[in-house]
From Swiss-Prot:
Putative tyrosine recombinase. Not involved in the cutting and rejoining of the recombining DNA molecules on dif(SL) site. Belongs to the 'phage' integrase family. XerD-like subfamily. It comes from Streptococcus sanguinis (strain SK36). Keywords: Cytoplasm, DNA integration, DNA recombination, DNA-binding. It comes from the Bacteria. GO terms for biological process: DNA transposition. One of its GO terms (molecular function) is tyrosine-based site-specific recombinase activity. GO terms for cellular component: cytoplasm. The keyword Disulfide bond does not apply. Residues 1-72 form the Core-binding (CB) domain. It is found in: Cytoplasm. Residues 85-243 form the Tyr recombinase domain. This is Tyrosine recombinase XerD-like. The active site is at residues 149, 210, 242.
């Protein structure tokens, strides 16, 4: 049945990234029903996704329903089946929580730690990546940042809100430097830690701020494929829990 996914997607006027997301959901569906569309198999599939967030279930069922209708139109199945999202209650504790970190935009006595936090929160950068950013890699006119890590290059959009924050740091060779040399990771860790303590957010870390970036992107409707590209990930495996 997987051979019908491509013809189904080809008839849809959607982006390549959307096609990848559709294909991923449909391949999972076909594997779960073992290539046989029956009421029992459909119930088994629906049970297999019941622990996902309601929004994720809705997206998956929408893709499956469209695919089922396509199969029915092409007379590949005898009757049209439609899956309906059940009413489920998900406890707050089970959900990843979006934090209100608007205070990060206020002035700080640890300005460099503050900028590091904002670059992680708004762009998903790793501290090690931030410390290696050269001034030449930052283009405020086009609002893009070039990152090179382990031979992999990527270009990331700089949010409008960060352009003015970066301006004061574009004077040397590196974004953060001393005598033309980039600071150590330990220095970066201390700067970030000092800022988070100042903000009363000592329990947060670079990793949790990066998670907040992912949650914010998902809240905006950004797909995991695009997020993985921005983060420089080779696969989406580590992002599965955000589906």
């Amino acid at each position: 049945m997987k051979e019908y996914i491509r013809p189904f997607l080809n008839q849809k006027n959607i982006s390549e990234n959307s096609k990848i997301a559709y294909s991923y959901d449909l391949e999972q569906f076909i594997e779960e029903v073992h290539d046989r569309i029956t009421e029992t198999n459909l119930r088994i599939y629906q049970a297999s996704i019941k622990d996902f967030k309601a929004a994720v279930q809705k997206r998956k069922l929408s893709a499956v329903n469209q695919f089922l209708y396509f199969l029915y139109q092409q007379q590949l199945i005898e009757e049209f089946h439609r899956l309906v999202l059940p009413k489920v209650s998900v406890s707050k504790e089970q959900e990843n929580e979006l934090l209100d970190l608007s205070a990060f935009w206020q002035e700080s006595s640890v300005p460099r730690g503050r900028l590091m936090a904002l670059l992680i929160l708004e762009m998903g950068l790793l501290p090690s990546e931030i410390l290696q950013v050269r001034v030449a890699d930052v283009n405020l006119d086009f609002q893009v940042l070039k990152i090179e890590k382990a031979g992999q290059k990527r270009v990331i959009k700089i949010p409008e809100s960060l352009t003015s924050e970066l301006e004061d740091y574009l004077t040397g060779t590196y974004l953060f430097e001393k005598n033309g040399k980039s600071y150590s990771r330990q220095w970066g860790f201390r700067q970030l830690e000092a800022f988070l303590i100042e903000q009363g957010q000592a329990s947060l870390s670079a990793q949790s701020l990066r998670e907040q970036f992912i949650l914010r992107q998902r809240e905006k409707g950004i797909g995991l494929y695009d997020i993985a590209q921005d983060l420089g990930l080779k696969t989406m495996i580590t992002l599965e829990k955000y589906r």
